[in-house]
Structures are given as C-alpha cells and as structure tokens.
C-alpha cells in the first residue's frame, strides 16, 4: 500500500471516538515538531491499523489506536511486529514519551526512556 498523502505527517488510524483518550501521545508528537493526521478507521485491529497507517505516511511511521490500546508502527517492520505498544492503564508520562518516540523515529534520533 503506497502513500496517498502529499503532506509529510505521521498517520494515525483511530477507531471511533478514541483520540480524546490519547491526548498526551499527540502532545508528545507535537513537542518534537512532527505533524500528524488523524483518520477514522472502521477496523478494530490496532496493530494492522498502525501498519497500514505507516504505509500511508510519507514519513513511514503510523499509529493505530482504540480506547484501550495504542500501537506505533514503522513501514519497514513486519506487520505483526510493531515498534511500541501502549495500554490505557499506563501513566501520562509514558503516553507522552511514546508520542515523543514516534516523532523521534521520523527524525532518526535516539528514543526517550518510557517509564510507566
């Protein structure tokens, strides 16, 4: 699946009404200065959504999320092997760090430690 976006951005495939849960992740991406685009997805397979989002992203990084789980994927990884997985129970610092790290993957700089 090739990218159909012209603007460089991390693509986020979200199931209905879940982006409000992951605000700290979005803030982490913004802190690193990387744009993102949110698209609704009818599928509930978060890992597959993340991989499809990475395939559509000109930056090769995608996120899939539901209300319970968020996954960061990279286009060059196998579909079943996401880079990061985050559950709703993890704290705000861990959520923000995952957003930072998704953006840092784009930048090619070292990841921040995630403490939950």
UniProtKB/Swiss-Prot annotation:
This is Propanediol dehydratase-reactivating factor small subunit. Forms a heterotetramer PduG(2)/PduH(2). Its cofactor is Mg(2+). It is found in: Bacterial microcompartment. It catalyses: ATP + H2O = ADP + phosphate + H(+). Belongs to the DdrB/PduH family. One of its GO terms (cellular component) is bacterial microcompartment. One of its GO terms (biological process) is propanediol catabolic process. Mg(2+) binds at residue 31. Keywords: Bacterial microcompartment, Chaperone, Hydrolase, Magnesium, Metal-binding. Small subunit of the propanediol dehydratase-reactivating factor (DDR), which reactivates suicidally inhibited adenosylcobalamin-dependent propanediol dehydratase (diol dehydratase, DDH) found in the bacterial microcompartment (BMC) dedicated to 1,2-propanediol (1,2-PD) degradation. Reactivates inactivated DDH in the presence of ATP, Mg(2+) and free adenosylcobalamin (AdoCbl), by mediating the exchange of the tightly bound damaged cofactor AdoCbl for a free intact one. Pathway: Polyol metabolism; 1,2-propanediol degradation. InterPro entries: B12-dep_deHydtase_bsu, Dehydtase/Dehydtase_re, Diol/glycerol_deHydtase_re_ssu. The keyword Repeat does not apply.
